[in-house]
Amino acid sequence: MSEQFQMTRRSMLAGAAIAGAVTPLIGAVSAHAEEAVAKTAHINVASLPRVKVDLVKPPFVHAHTQKAEGGPKVVEFTLTIEEKKIVIDEQGTELHAMTFNGSVPGPLMVVHQDDYVELTLINPDTNTLQHNIDFHSATGALGGGALTVVNPGDTTVLRFKASKAGVFVYHCAPPGMVPWHVTSGMNGAIMVLPREGLTDGKGNSITYDKVYYVGEQDFYVPRDANGKFKKYESVGEAYADTLEVMRTLTPSHIVFNGAVGALTGDSALKAAVGEKVLIVHSQANRDTRPHLIGGHGDYVWATGKFRNAPDVDQETWFIPGGTAGAAFYTFEQPGIYAYVNHNLIEAFELGAAAHFAVTGDWNDDLMTSVRAPSGT
């Protein structure tokens, strides 16, 4: 192994080999964290009820109520950081991923507006890198990033008020290494529901039967001189080559939920005719254009903020990079629906596609074959 990749545990934690001089930044972060904690210590949440939530792996979402029951609560979550090797396509391409709870994307968290999110963030000593978490739904301290820097073996607890309603990205944002961590899979989403639940913007309630979470991820896997994807012994060894690919702004893969085909075949998203489905879709880094082939977005919050009235009857919706969006659809016909990023090169060539497998009875009034294909 070359000297470039012979990083000691200490140098990796400090970021000396891969992120420049981070140690002064860590000191500044610690001082800022102490000041911020002191300023907010007067907030009394001890009297609020507490709810502990067990998160589940996407595309599924933990049990929750769509309308708040009672007043604000403290909702407790735990995320454990896991650095792990994953396979991202049928050709066996490997990536040293950085993950929350072992999945790409990390789990979707659900609370109600004005609840308090209390997150325990664990960086086990089996990891090699420093991490943190930035919630786009939070106010202050770099979205919590300044208060949650954890070295391997560290645990921290962050609490913030979910004051804005919508779906929001969260991601790792350690000093000097943000894009590397984000494009290595370290991102997820949180849904902050209005206390009265979703509405159509005209005061009418919208309720869903199912919710699925699709996390779109761009990966940047280096190739060797023969064009084959390279493999590495560790996440640190891959850093320099990965950074070169990242700087081209040209992903090797753009996938849903961590791998090409992860939400197809036996893993397709399930629904039935008449079911109302909410699709939460995040992209922490690049713009995307979700489209449900054969269906629509009955109600769409493309930038994910529920205070805004939804767009209706959408064919394709635009989600800017660093954003989560939400789309609601009532399935009307059975069959296999492809759900894609409608940059079709990214969908068909790079992997940004999923399937909905929908059961039920066919409605000839909506579509029928008048004449089957045949010779003239």
From Swiss-Prot:
UniProt signal peptide: 1-33
Keyword terms: Copper, FAD, Flavoprotein, Metal-binding, Nitrate assimilation, Oxidoreductase, Periplasm, Plasmid, Repeat, Signal
Location in the cell: Periplasm
Cofactor(s) of this protein: Cu(2+); Cu(+); FAD
Main location: periplasm
Natural source organism: Rhizobium meliloti (strain 1021) (Ensifer meliloti)
Enzyme Commission number: 1.7.2.1
UniProt modification remark: Predicted to be exported by the Tat system. The position of the signal peptide cleavage has not been experimentally proven.
Binding annotation for Cu cation 1: 131, 172, 181, 186
InterPro entries in alphabetical order: Cu-oxidase-like_N, Cu-oxidase_2nd, Cupredoxin, NO2-reductase_Cu, TAT_signal
Record's subunit section: Homotrimer.
EC class name: oxidoreductase
Domain notes: The type I copper site in NIR plays a crucial role for electron transfer from pseudoazurin to the type II copper site of NIR, which comprises the catalytic center of NIR for the reduction of nitrite.
GO biological process: denitrification pathway; nitrate assimilation
Protein family (similarity comment): Belongs to the multicopper oxidase family.
The name this protein goes by in its record: Copper-containing nitrite reductase
PROSITE patterns, alphabetized: TAT (PS51318)
Catalysis: reaction(s): nitric oxide + Fe(III)-[cytochrome c] + H2O = Fe(II)-[cytochrome c] + nitrite + 2 H(+)
Domain of life per record: Bacteria
Record Pfam families: Cu-oxidase, Cu-oxidase_3
Every Plastocyanin-like domain range: 98-193, 258-359
GO molecular function, one term: copper ion binding
Binding site for Cu cation 2: 136, 171, 342
Pathway info: Nitrogen metabolism; nitrate reduction (denitrification); dinitrogen from nitrate: step 2/4
Cofactor note: Binds 1 Cu(2+) ion. The Cu(2+) ion is held by residues from each of 2 monomers of the trimer. Nitrite is bound to the Cu(2+) ion site. Pseudoazurin is the physiological electron donor for the Cu-NIR in vitro. Binds 1 Cu(+) ion. The Cu(+) ion is bound within a single monomer.
Gene Ontology CC terms, in alphabetical order: periplasmic space
